[in-house]
């Protein structure tokens, strides 16, 4: 395989087999990649080597090599990934240098860039921590978002939305016992809220609809059925308004599923059955093994949450 093929192979297998994904990444010479491949390569270095395997020093070394290949003006996304790996590797000098460059490249202060880097680093660390520690880390990373400079549109909004989305999704999928932890519960709700705030500023209607799905999923995980139903219905209303071509039928299936689950918990049996039937009909047309497996996982997860 050439470098791009190895990268694609790593991207396909890393969740199911992170060791193989890491081996593929290690075999890639960054100089042999096309510039268009660099963002995915940088993302996978941190996601696989740090989040999956706990190897921040190696990720940091490889991020530095990538920046050397990228030249004098690396894309902001490369600087962000490099700053995150430096932070988690304990390389404070490189962290601050990359964060300063990242801030300059995105027209924000170094302080705000550092806050985004810390949020992204938290997203990598949260999955490996216990419930209370994960919740506390997430809340600490969210705290700077209350500052005035985060209340206006900036070039960091999309990245902040994505990082909050990642943290909320990870926390919502924790073992059921973890969902009883007060710190984690506060963290998952607040990260989902912040994700929606940023997507409303920076995203398209599809991002807005998916933020509603995340809010529904989180509310369901927390046992807040009324809120879950309301968020799911808001997302479905956005689809009704914008998706006449039915290009987002996968999104609709998962929103209907969350609506069905919420209605079951609320005792709305007929409404639940109708929503579940619509979800199942849409899922039957996925023609994608991964999506079908994900749908079945959500069905089982909702069954467990319902108790």
Question: Language-model segments: which ranges?
Answer:
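Amphipathic alpha-helical repeat scaffolds of TPR domains
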Residues: 4-7, 36-47, 74-81, 110-129, ...
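C-terminal non-catalytic interaction modules
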Residues: 9, 259-307
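Residue at a conserved register position within TPR or TPR-like alpha-solenoid repeats
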Residues: 13, 49-50, 86-87, 123, ...
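Residues in the short coil linking paired helices within alpha-helical repeat scaffolds
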Residues: 17, 54-55, 91-92, 127-134, ...
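Amphipathic alpha-helical segments of tetratricopeptide repeats
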Residues: 26-30, 64-71, 100-108, 139-152, ...
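Structural signature of alpha-solenoid helical repeat junctions
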Residues: 37-38, 74-78, 111-113, 152-163, ...
């Amino acid at each position: 395989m050439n470098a791009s093929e190895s990268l694609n192979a790593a991207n396909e297998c890393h969740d199911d087999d992170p060791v193989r994904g890491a081996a593929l990444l290690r075999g890639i010479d960054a100089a042999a990649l096309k510039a268009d491949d660099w963002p995915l390569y940088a993302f996978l270095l941190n996601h696989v080597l740090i989040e999956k395997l706990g190897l921040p020093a190696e990720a940091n070394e490889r991020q530095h090599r990538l920046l050397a290949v990228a030249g004098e003006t690396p894309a902001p996304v490369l600087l962000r990934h490099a700053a995150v790996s430096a932070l988690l590797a304990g390389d404070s000098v490189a962290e601050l240098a990359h964060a300063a460059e990242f801030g300059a490249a995105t027209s924000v202060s170094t302080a705000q860039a550092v806050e985004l880097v810390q949020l992204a680093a938290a997203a990598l660390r949260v999955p490996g921590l216990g419930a209370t520690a994960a919740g506390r880390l997430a809340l600490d990373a969210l705290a700077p978002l209350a500052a005035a400079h985060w209340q206006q549109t900036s070039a960091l909004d999309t990245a902040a939305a994505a990082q909050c989305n990642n943290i909320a999704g990870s926390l919502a999928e924790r073992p059921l016992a973890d969902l009883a932890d007060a710190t984690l519960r506060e963290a998952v709700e607040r990260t989902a809220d912040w994700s929606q705030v940023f997507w409303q500023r920076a995203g398209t209607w599809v991002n807005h609809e998916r933020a509603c799905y995340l809010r529904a999923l989180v509310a369901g995980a927390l046992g807040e059925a009324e809120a879950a139903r309301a968020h799911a219905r808001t997302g479905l209303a956005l689809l009704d308004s914008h998706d006449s071509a039915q290009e987002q039928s996968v999104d609709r299936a998962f929103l209907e599923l969350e609506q069905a689950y919420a209605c079951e918990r609320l005792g709305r049996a007929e409404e639940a059955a109708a929503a579940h039937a619509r979800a199942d009909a849409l899922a039957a047309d996925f023609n994608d093994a991964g999506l079908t497996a994900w749908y079945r996982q959500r069905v089982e997860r909702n069954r467990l949450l319902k108790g």
